[in-house]
Amino acid sequence: MAEGEITTFSALTERFNLPPGNYKKPKLLYCSNGGHFLRILPDGTVDGTRDRSDQHIQLQLSAESAGEVYIKGTETGQYLAMDTDGLLYGSQTPNEECLFLERLEENHYNTYTSKKHAEKNWFVGLKKNGSCKRGPRTHYGQKAILFLPLPVSSD
């Protein structure tokens, strides 16, 4: 290889015949603020619970493209979404309100910013009591927006 040449590699999904973004196992999103797991309930309510055995905390993260993810409750089949007021809810179908920008922070936690409201920097967040924090009330540096993706235990 001559100096200055660039070698490119085919996408791993093509090379290993993996489905794009849907090969991950379900995860739990543990919030640094109050120790709650993000939960999507059958009625579309989004909140947090400390009950690790709750089936509604199992979430499937699937990549739309690099750094962009859909978050779907495996039990309810609903997608995490943020409306125009910054409220989190469960949506039956994926739409532009369901797409989030996933970012790995220096402290190894992840943050999820609404792609639709990216210019406003609205994050997914949970208060210490487990209720949702509205997008306009979130900002970088808060513990409420820090989530640690954990594997679902096989107990």
Swiss-Prot record:
Pfam families: FGF. Monomer. Homodimer. Interacts with FGFR1, FGFR2, FGFR3 and FGFR4. Affinity between fibroblast growth factors (FGFs) and their receptors is increased by heparan sulfate glycosaminoglycans that function as coreceptors. Found in a complex with FGFBP1, FGF1 and FGF2. Interacts with FGFBP1. Part of a Cu(2+)-dependent multiprotein aggregate containing FGF1, S100A13 and SYT1. Interacts with SYT1. Interacts with S100A13. Interacts with LRRC59. Interacts with CSNKA, CSNKB and FIBP. While binding with LRRC59, CSNKA and FIBP seem mutually exclusive, CSNKB and FIBP may cooperatively interact with FGF1. It comes from the Eukaryota. The modification N-acetylalanine is found at A2. One of its GO terms (molecular function) is integrin binding. PANTHER family: FIBROBLAST GROWTH FACTOR. Heparin binds at N33. This is Fibroblast growth factor 1. Disulfide bonds: none annotated. The gene is FGF1.
